[in-house]
């Protein structure tokens, strides 16, 4: 389960950030989940809560935001969102994209011109979007 590895990295990053800034406590973390990554938020939240026990982040509040997947065609410049085409995916394709997001290029084409030459402009990956530490202004 890669959610546990992600959780470990998130908690370690927040703690390191607090320590680098001379703070004794992490109060909150905002975690961005890319839609294309399709991370199980419930498992990730559970893992973060377990990993932060006994640390300066133990009482930190968690906030999750979902970043919609967006694409831009390199051929015609068209921009579209995953939600616009996702209903055409079967469960196998959804699972393939979950584990290896790069395969999205094998299953998606620009809805405007049909090109498979596009870039993922948003909604990929998982990252710590914000950290609130002791002493931050409200």
Swiss-Prot record:
Pfam families, sorted: HypA (PF01155)
Keyword Glycoprotein appears in the UniProt entry: no
Signal peptide: none
Matching InterPro entries: HypA/HybF (IPR000688)
Chain sites annotated for binding Ni(2+): 2
Molecular function, one GO term: nickel cation binding
Superkingdom in the source lineage: Archaea
Job description of the protein: Involved in the maturation of [NiFe] hydrogenases. Required for nickel insertion into the metal center of the hydrogenase.
Assigned protein family: Belongs to the HypA/HybF family.
This protein's name: Hydrogenase maturation factor HypA
Species: Thermococcus sibiricus (strain DSM 12597 / MM 739)
